[in-house]
């Protein structure tokens, strides 16, 4: 299996990188940087890049490139930043594992890197999330939350 996720885990959260790789490879063959951080650091990024001064669950930073055929040039897709604090809190709240919550946030971030935007696409991104959640046998509590 070709590794496409470059992991920078700045926390103690356990990360099932093989499971995330399978999800990523079902959607792209381009490299993805995945940063797992805490609420303090993600709040700083949220403030700097989105003008929102609060922590959030996941941020995506697509790599802008002038090429039309990006995959030909092996250019990375971008960076996904996930808050381990949110992963732990939401897993507890919704009654599923931290790994399942991490997978959901990874899927959400990856779809943003691929150009989906739930704020403007009339449900297209949510539908794609649902399909991936079902394809990988993730708990229905992840789907319900996204409706």
UniProtKB/Swiss-Prot annotation:
GO CC terms, sorted: cytoplasm
The domain of life for this entry's organism is: Bacteria
A Pfam family it matches? YbeY
PROSITE patterns referenced in this protein's UniProt entry, alphabetically: UPF0054
Q: Where along the chain is Zn(2+) bound? A: 108, 112, 118
Cofactor(s) needed by this chain: Zn(2+)
Return the cofactor note field.
Binds 1 zinc ion.
Keyword Cytoplasm present in the record's keywords: the answer is yes
Q: According to its UniProt record, which protein family does this protein belong to?
A: Belongs to the endoribonuclease YbeY family.
Function statement: Single strand-specific metallo-endoribonuclease involved in late-stage 70S ribosome quality control and in maturation of the 3' terminus of the 16S rRNA.
Q: What is this protein called?
A: Endoribonuclease YbeY
Look up and give the organism this protein is from. Answer: Sulfurovum sp. (strain NBC37-1)
The encoding gene is ybeY
């Amino acid at each position: 299996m070709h590794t496409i996720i470059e992991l920078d885990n700045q926390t103690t959260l356990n990360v099932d990188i093989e499971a995330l790789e399978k999800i990523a490879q079902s959607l792209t063959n381009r490299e993805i940087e995945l940063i797992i951080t805490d609420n303090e650091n993600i709040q700083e990024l949220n403030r700097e890049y989105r003008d929102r001064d609060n922590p959030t669950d996941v941020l995506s930073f697509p790599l802008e490139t002038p090429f039309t055929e990006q995959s030909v040039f092996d250019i990375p897709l971008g960076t996904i930043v996930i808050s381990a604090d949110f992963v732990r809190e939401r897993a507890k709240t919704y009654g599923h594992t931290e790994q399942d919550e991490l997978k959901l946030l990874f899927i959400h971030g990856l779809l943003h890197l691929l150009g989906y935007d739930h704020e403007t696409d009339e449900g297209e991104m949510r539908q794609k999330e649902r399909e991936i959640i079902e394809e990988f046998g993730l708990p229905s509590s992840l789907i319900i939350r996204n409706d």
